Amino acid sequence: MNDSTAPTAPAELSEFIENRTYVEIQVGDQSVLTRTLRPEDIQLFAIMSGDVNPAHVDPEYARSSLFHEVIAHGMWGGALISTVLGTEFPGPGTIYISQTLKFSRPVKVGDTITITVTCMQKFDHNKHIVFDCVCTNQDGLKVIRGEAEVLAPTEKIKRARMAMPEITISDRDARYRRLFGRAQGLKAVKAAFVHPCDLSSLQAATSVRDSGLMEPVLIGPEARLRGLIEQHRLKLGTTRIINVSHSHAAAARAVELARNDDVAALVQGSLTTEELLRAVIMPHGLRVAGRLSHVLYIDVPSHPRPLIITDMMVNIEPTLAHKVDIVQNAIDFAHLMGVPEPKVAVLAGIETVTPRMRATLDAAALCKMADRGQIVGGVIDGPLGFDNAVSLISARAAGLKSVVAGQADVLLAPDLESGNMLAKQLEHLSDAISGGVVLGGQVPIVLANRGDSVDSRIASCVLALIVANQYRSRRRA
């Protein structure tokens, strides 16, 4: 699940906000409001109030609490009572005098709460009104009961309802936790960290080790590595270091370890991508029948599901034959990530096929190859522009009738440049989180950008772990 945007107002609200004056209200009059509690309501209330009691915001803690799950802040219900009094009954011009509340049972995520405010007493000498306030859940059980006293408005007020700004809750940690959770229950693997002569690489290595995801093997100049570890006060523990003099030798040794099944994954350190991949694709490297390609698993907060972008790091100008392998690798990876029949959008600048744009010809050919069973396991459509690949609104406006258009799981970029720019735009301008891995070799390979955070590197290691476990199962079968 991705980060969400809170609606500005329920659909049933009118465009005007209007009060009921003291003389218009009679004893026994009521107003009713209904709300369903969402996880983001709890998050937003916690952010606004500063009340980060773990009973409300920490699912792990909540499971061991009295109610065994996250519950709403008590004052969320109180705020809904205030909403009725301040916006509907009496409405604008109302001034709170006092409020009592008694909490009978918890409100949980998914509960639908009905707030009923009833006029109980009126005092003509000061225009005060006492209201009975009751909140019941979807089972008709009272969760909150109280009494409010207000100074009611004496003048009629009717104004256009103000349009409130959208609020997006961006919880990067939660999105990373969801991704890391995919490794739960998987067996840790040995991974060669190739020339990890920088802080981020070493932090990632120690983090995946401490998390039980991987058993890192550090390959590089031992004296330099130990110096960095000591300088940054990292705990080496029993982590093995293989001493080699330079980055070329580190890449070669890592490939040798993988070829001999001594490690199940490679993780790029501070050497260049070209340097590492050159060792991988050597005649006695790690290539198998298909072509190597990179997949980026990216979670954009404004999008309803994660996307897989390929290829942004390995194939510079892929041919049609190359794209067949790239698409198949991405489909197989999507299966591992829980997408049973991934929808693949072959991206181009336009939706029509024209010989003047090679990307459109490749898209048409790939679709036909999928029809003929030359690419299996997914549904492919293209050419599609990026907007029509990810937005149903755009796809419908363009008149595109396709199960892929607007609902793509996989985005195949025309070339490395476009894929790289697309991915980095989402990462840097849309607050996306991501992890990537190279597929198609004997073992998965994690490539790193200089600007990658430690969390991003760990995310990539999680993906490599998922793939490595699949490769291991396949070999045993």
Residue ranges and their predicted role:
Residues 87-111, 115:
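Mid-chain, well-packed structural core segment of small domains
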Residues 98, 128-130, 292:
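Short coil/loop residues immediately preceding or within conserved phosphate-binding loops
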Residues 169-217, 221-404, 409-477:
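Anion-binding alpha/beta catalytic cores of soluble intermediary-metabolism enzymes, centered on
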Residues 2-12, 17-30, 108-169:
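HotDog/MaoC-like acyl-thioester-processing domains
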Residues 2-94, 98:
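Hot-dog-fold acyl-thioester-processing enzymes
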Residues 104, 134, 347-349:
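Short loop/turn motifs enriched for small/polar and acidic residues
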Residues 83, 103-105, 119-121, 137, ...:
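A residue-level detector for short acidic-glycine micro-motifs
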Residues 28, 45, 74, 81, ...:
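Buried hydrophobic positions in well-ordered alpha/beta secondary-structure cores of metabolic enzymes
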